Amino acid sequence: TLLEMKKKMLGLIEELNPESELLTDDPDIAAKINDVINMKLFELARMKKIPKYVEFEVNEGELIDYTRIEQESGSEVYQISLVEGVAYEFKAQGTIIKALESGTMGIDFFVYPERITETTKAKGYEFELTPDALEIMPYGVAGDLLKSDKSSSYGNVYSVQYENMKRELDPRYNMSSITIEGGVSI
């Protein structure tokens, strides 16, 4: 949860006060923490993509854009991965799908994470990132929160650790795939 992430990160930089509603006594950290978590969350989500799947009926010639996929799935689309079920072609650099026949279209796609705002409940917010990405996130947040603190080099230490750990992330969702339909003429 967001609450666990904040506790872990604030404990890492020795700024955790479990008695405080904001979990810290430092007003600068309290003011910036959600924005910095969002930055790292979106950065990691581009590396460790969050997969979703949706199916819906389409008609021949129908154009399916991100808005339709978002309406059907309830998630903000980052990138389309795979389309199946009906013949189709991509338009507008892969952001629109033209159905070449009627039927049930299945779409594998990746989504943006849910943005953390001032009204987000720390106990109720669940991260959609993989466990390996969540393990390194506190280091990235700590590095960014402390980088403006000129009195210590803690920010740099955490930033370097984060960058090193980021290189070791499991690339499973980053692997490309190819589908060949209809055979090949030689």
Predicted features, each with a name:
Residues 1-186:
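Glycine-enriched, solvent-exposed interface loops adjoining structured elements
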